[in-house]
A protein has these predicted regions:
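Short polar/acidic secondary-structure junctions
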Residues: 170-171, 233
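Active-site proximal loops enriched in glycine and acidic residues that flank catalytic Cys/His/Asp
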Residues: 145, 168, 300
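Terminal accessory/targeting
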Residues: 1-42, 54-57, 61-88, 186-301
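Acidic, His- and aromatic-enriched active-site or binding-groove loops in soluble protein domains
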Residues: 161-170
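Short, hydrophobic beta-strand segments that form beta-sheet elements in well-ordered domains
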Residues: 23-27, 141, 163-164
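Metal-dependent polysaccharide deacetylase catalytic core of the NodB/CE4 family, i.e.
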Residues: 1-5, 34-44, 52-154, 162, ...
Length: 301
């Protein structure tokens, strides 16, 4: 699928770009330490969602040969199904000390729309299968479709996960909510080389708080009233620019500062479809770009 796939030649070129820029890969086992240390060094945590067989056949031999660390997120219901990896293949990969097999739910359904009981039952089943097939569950979780609500986040935390990833863009740092960590999606649509090079030159955009705290929007709260409280040490914050896909069309957002560190984003039209997105960027004095992505899940109710 173009939305979840990248051509192998493009993938090889991306790895070469990372190597040429002397950017290191993070071993998932060192993730907690890396968040707190080595903050001046750009590093990449590679994640792969879904566990498709094409990954095992094409990308895995390359990553194994180069010993490039990564997290492979798998949904337990799909393992062994047509075009998906088997548990034997997953176990083979998991034996390498630079690989983490992350939890991606059991069913890979749109769980953010479901009741707490259904979410809990789904995650409990995936954990049970992880323990049976791999001997343990993972500390890492990836929300199906990158969609979450506050309730979903609490459930994931209560099950003992330490980190959970969405699909909103941005750079991770120690100030981020560990249960809504950003990632840059790279696929056939968003894998163009110029874009990829620009992503390797982004920095964390640190903030204290984003409002609304709930990223699952009922129609009564769509469009949301968005406010971001930034940290004081960000230079040239008044030069920030933001874009959103309100009204089903990407456009520059009208923004207003309440004070030197508090930004209001005027989302004038409703978000259409399943997801609403806002991206804010700011050129740093170093020449790199600070990047912050926000994703809302839009309820039909």
């Amino acid at each position: 699928y173009p939305s979840t796939n990248i051509k192998i030649d493009d993938f090889k070129r991306h790895l070469k770009i990372i190597e040429e820029n002397k950017i290191e890969f993070i071993n998932p086992k060192d993730f907690e330490n890396e968040l707190q240390n080595n903050k001046l060094q750009r590093k990449i945590l590679l994640t792969i969602d879904d566990g498709f067989l094409s990954f095992y056949k094409n990308a895995w031999p390359i990553l194994k040969d180069k010993k490039i660390p990564f997290i492979l997120f798998v949904s337990t219901r799909e393992v062994g199904a047509y075009n998906y990896m088997t548990w034997d293949q997953i176990r083979e990969i998991s034996e390498e000390d630079f690989v983490e097999i992350g939890n991606h739910s059991h069913t890979h359904e749109y769980l953010a729309d479901e009741s707490n009981k259904l979410i809990k039952d789904d995650i409990a089943k995936s954990i049970s299968i992880f323990k049976k097939k791999l001997g343990k569950n993972s500390d890492f979780f990836s929300y199906p479709f990158g969609e979450y609500s506050n309730n979903f986040k609490i459930i994931i935390k209560d099950f003992g996960f330490k980190y959970a990833f969405g699909q909103h863009s941005g750079v991770i740092d120690e100030t981020k909510d560990f249960y809504e960590l950003p990632r840059y999606p790279i696929n056939e649509k968003y894998g163009e080389f110029k874009r990829f090079k620009s992503l390797t030159k982004t920095l964390p955009f640190k903030y204290k708080k984003i409002y609304p705290d709930e990223k699952y929007l009922l129609q009564a709260n769509n469009p949301p009233k968005v406010k971001i409280e930034f940290h004081k040490d960000i230079k040239n914050l008044d030069a920030v620019s933001c874009y959103s896909n309100e009204g089903n069309e990407w456009r520059q957002s009208n923004i207003k500062f309440e004070n030197s560190t508090t930004l209001f984003i005027n989302v004038a039209e409703k978000f259409i479809g399943e997801r609403g997105r806002i991206n804010c960027s700011l050129r740093d004095p170093s020449g790199l770009w600070r990047w912050l992505g926000i994703q809302f899940v839009i309820s039909e109710k």
